[in-house]
Amino acid sequence: MTGAGPGLTPELAVGYLQELSADIRAAVVLTPGGEPVAGPPELAAAASRLLAAAPEAAEIEVAVAAGAVHAARGERHAVVAVCGRYALPALIRYDLKVVLGELAADPDGGEPAERTEAA
């Protein structure tokens, strides 16, 4: 698998995850504190609650009949992915770790650039 490349932003990370696996239905990137950075807003609140429920866990997997939710944390970001029922957990966890590594390598920290008003 080829890495996402340097300068992966949280917005690009969400799309990259969905390209990596057809089983990933949606993904969200959050700060370590659970604040949403990128991804669908309707997923961000639930993802934040999931991470808050297991504050010491580096990885989380919740499976139900319809699919699974996988989460992974790094020092600078957390990533949560909603997957279909046939997703392979080990591969999804690997993909999440790859994305976390690429986000950590971003010199800007994955934060949106400051916007300046045009004069």
PLM feature segments, named:
Residues 1-119:
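Non-catalytic interaction/Regulatory regions outside core domains
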